[in-house]
């Protein structure tokens, strides 16, 4: 190989490696500020605020983490923000009232259209909606199984989880859960799904292979209205936000027994766990703050002011 060609290939490889480096930024959607707060996770300080559009709620990364996607409920669009330059790149048509979404490893965005009672599949590369899938009333949470073969959508008023085959985009099962299901998370091995039910005050455990609920537990937190749920790195623990109960419930993933309660800010909503599992970030919607929790001690180690009514949070680390 000629030296010039080798040098060029090495330069390209180094550039790709540099682009893969994390930014160590935490991104927070602020529902009533129409903005995205960008936090430096190393200093726990807000780096900047990005105007994104009307009523930002659901938030996620592209598979390469080069872009942040934000659902704009009052614009019927998905905002695309460059995760490094922090510039608003474009807006993609999403269908009516997008609330939450999940990004498939192939790059497609699976989203809930809350007031249209459907889920949509959006290709960010072309900007086209590839499929529209009827589901229950007021679809909310969306998750994709670790193997990428299923999407799950919760419907708040139908009290169900709708299981959708990928790439067929057909509903294969409708699973009744607790009242007003909000969010779904998965074990890393793809065996279990965990579903929060806001009005029911419950967490349910769903066997993905059989599409059956195997266990449901009430949270041991007064006035708990569970919303967000994430699974710990070792798969042994669930962290569940409790809405107006102003706490995070720490739950055994095997037995659904509650192990601890962590007091945070008012109306705790979206959650995100750092890649190494050592830090949990919570959106406190009525305090306009984000709490940072040390998961080794279950203690809040920082409280960060952000925009008005923080809804969702993700971290690039």
How would you label these PLM feature ranges?
Residues 10-11, 16-317:
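Predominantly soluble domains enriched in secretory-pathway, periplasmic, or organellar proteins
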Residues 1-8:
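Bacterial N-terminal signal peptides that target proteins for export
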